[in-house]
Amino acid sequence: MLGELVYVKKDDLNKITRIWKSSEFKTGKFKTGWHPPHPSFFVKHEVYEKFGVFREDLEIAADYELMLRFLEKHKVKSAYIPQTLVKMREGGKSNWKSFSKVLKANLECYRSFKINQLPVSPFFIFIKPFSKIKQIRT
């Protein structure tokens, strides 16, 4: 199950800074930069038992790799709920305000394709950030 997420200011829960609209998953979407917001991505316990848990060798993109592995590699069925499931404060390891963290996150996302033996363009690390620009609110 996956749905929408909104980011809010750390000190103002009513000030929305980013709206992450997801969509139905279709095979191949990860290669375009799309992925569901990890806090609003839920799977049954059995999926973890069958396909594994988070990789601890990925500092920032362990959530991305897990969703890629479940949805793209193992074709786990998903259902999209077109409503906000999570309201979350800004911050986190891949904070958009730090270029070095964004670059590291995208390199780890690229590596996630290689780990799962899935094809990906070498331009992916440039494509992925641009897919999120329209989510930002001022």
Residue ranges and their predicted role:
Residues M1, V6, K77, K128-Q135:
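Solvent-exposed, well-ordered amphipathic alpha-helical segments
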Residues G3-E4, K9, K15-A105:
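Conserved nucleotide-sugar donor-binding catalytic segment
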Residues K87, G91-T138:
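Hydrophobic helical membrane-anchoring modules
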